[in-house]
Amino acid sequence: MQTIICVEQLSKTFNQHQALHAVDLNIHHGEMVALLGPSGSGKSTLLRHLSGLITGDKSAGSHIELLGRTVQREGRLARDIRKSRANTGYIFQQFNLVNRLSVLENVLIGALGSTPFWRTCFSWFTREQKQRALQALTRVGMAHFAYQRVSTLSGGQQQRVAIARALMQQAKVILADEPIASLDPESARIVMDTLRDINQNDGITVVVTLHQVDYALRYCERIVALRQGHVFYDGSSQQFDNERFDHLYRSINRVEENAKAA
């Protein structure tokens, strides 16, 4: 299988706290992978490194590649990082949309990387680009909201607009950081259904960080679980059993309880 994301010996230290410890990870074309773990495990930190939003420690041998391009090496971003980012759609927990713009205009933002600069200054998008944006909204069930201001939408609807923007970008990889953390169960289901649909029908590789184990088991064939910055488990979701769940979550809770008692 073609390797889409390659992480080698990635470490990250914030002040004196080491968030990631020499992480190695390979993700293949067409996979939908859940990064799982309790708060502070390093899963969101790892995801941000994949698109170069943050850089790792300057440790020898550390390296991240995405779609065959270097994203960062030994704590330094690649000079052509924009080319890697152009192929990566990033979906944030807090939606990261422009509230004053319409739904359609927010989706068209996904085309900025492939639009001449002078046109972007005036928001001049072609008819073909607008048609593609409407098609992306249709894919996520949001076309009938196209001309509505995005600030009027619910959280789940805004998250689907963010996914449509990634489709407009023609991203080959989607990195979703806690996309359902603030959503009600029905909205969370719709968002995860949408991510699975584009993964299965468009062949887009999806990496999603989750707190909810049940969603990871239901939607992702592979789970990468992090515990205190280390890869604790990397394998089939079917083999992520109660014993592993207990060791991943409840042992962390016991450590926190002991710290409070002390």
From Swiss-Prot:
Enzyme superclass (EC): translocase
GO MF annotation, one: ABC-type phosphonate transporter activity
Gene label: phnC
Oligomer status and interactors: The complex is composed of two ATP-binding proteins (PhnC), two transmembrane proteins (PhnE) and a solute-binding protein (PhnD).
Family (UniProt): Belongs to the ABC transporter superfamily. Phosphonates importer (TC 3.A.1.9.1) family.
Any Gene Ontology CC annotation: plasma membrane
One Pfam family, short name: ABC_tran
Cellular localisation: Cell inner membrane
SUPFAM superfamilies from the UniProt entry: P-loop containing nucleoside triphosphate hydrolases (SSF52540)
Domain ABC transporter: 5-253
Keyword terms of this UniProt record: ATP-binding, Cell inner membrane, Cell membrane, Membrane, Nucleotide-binding, Phosphonate transport, Translocase, Transport
CDD domains associated with the record: ABC_PhnC_transporter
Catalysed reactions, semicolon-separated: phosphonate(out) + ATP + H2O = phosphonate(in) + ADP + phosphate + H(+)
Binding site for ATP: 37-44
Database matches in PANTHER family: AMINO ACID IMPORT ATP-BINDING PROTEIN, PHOSPHONATES IMPORT ATP-BINDING PROTEIN PHNC
Purpose of the protein: Part of the ABC transporter complex PhnCDE involved in phosphonates import. Responsible for energy coupling to the transport system.
Species whose genome carries this gene: Escherichia coli O157:H7
Name of the featured protein: Phosphonates import ATP-binding protein PhnC
Membrane topology: Peripheral membrane protein
Main subcellular location of this protein, as a coarse class: membrane
Enzyme Commission number(s) of this protein: 7.3.2.2
